Amino acid sequence: MKALVYVGEKKLDFREVPNPVVNSGEQLIKVDSAGICGSDMHAYLGHDERRPAPLILGHEASGIILGGDRNGERVAINPLVTCMRCQACISGRENICSTRQIISMAPREG
């Protein structure tokens, strides 16, 4: 697939990257629209060490699910990747999951 990759301060490269691996409980989404957030700009300007180059930025997106029971469904992407097993997740407070990851921050690409 093609992606715009952050490769260093104020540097982006439009390139071919490997297709994403879809893990259990995840969906493959063909992104139709993506927003540029303030945190993406911080990374682009070199002000966020949590987003080291090279990295596919972007965590505000929408698109269409490809495959599975929900094939073709239009969705907005929740950028949080959580365990869904801890007390916070079980009680509906995934935003404070102690193992949460955010799409577009290592180790998760955007």
Model regions and ranges:
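Extreme N-terminal starter segment of soluble prokaryotic enzymes
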Residues: 1-2
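A generic beta-sheet turn/junction motif
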Residues: 7-10, 81
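Short N-terminal binding/cap micro-motifs at the start of the first secondary-structure element
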Residues: 10-14, 38-39
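Generic structural signal for helix capping and beta-alpha/helix-loop junctions
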Residues: 13, 84-85, 96
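A short, acidic/glycine-rich surface segment
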Residues: 13-15, 50-52, 99, 104-107
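Glycine-rich beta-strand-centered segment in the early N-terminal region that forms part
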Residues: 18-34, 47-90, 109-110
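Iron-sulfur (Fe-S) cluster-binding segments and ferredoxin-like electron-carrier domains
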Residues: 41-45, 90-109
